[in-house]
Amino acid sequence: MSTLADVQNQSDTRGIILGKVGVTGVYHPLTIRDKTTETQTVTGKFDIFVGLHPDQRGAHLSHLVDGLHKYASTLFSMDDLVGLIKDIRSKQDQEGIPFTDANIEVTFKYFLEKSAPSSEMKSLVGYDCGFHVELNGSGHKAVSVTVPVSTVCPCSQEISDNGAHNQ
């Protein structure tokens, strides 16, 4: 029985740059801390990419997700994403497959309890949140939060006894 050649580990002489090789939609649990030191376990959706040198054919994609488990049992932060990229780089370097740059994005729904303006009823509001880290010359880090907003039409609020419609 013959073995299958590991072509991704062979040199590529065509000089084609693979600027973005990776995995998308990898779900993993995370524990996030808010500003009051409360914690919440969320489901993170990870997209992890690396850029390759022109003489490389590919990367070990399993290395891109191997490190996620390490961070599932700790409080997750932006610094953990930087640590994850460094762990991936170390593994790729050990395999002789260094990358030119990397980026990781994790998105998740974070819930906060809010009170309704008039009834004071409490309910959970989900916020779309995300962390994004790039490991390249810039070392870019970003945090994103999408806040749901609805406003009330001032005219209908003025003429209504029972509330107003949203805009």
Which sequence ranges carry the predicted segments?
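N-terminal intrinsically disordered, cationic/polar leader segments
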Residues: 1-167
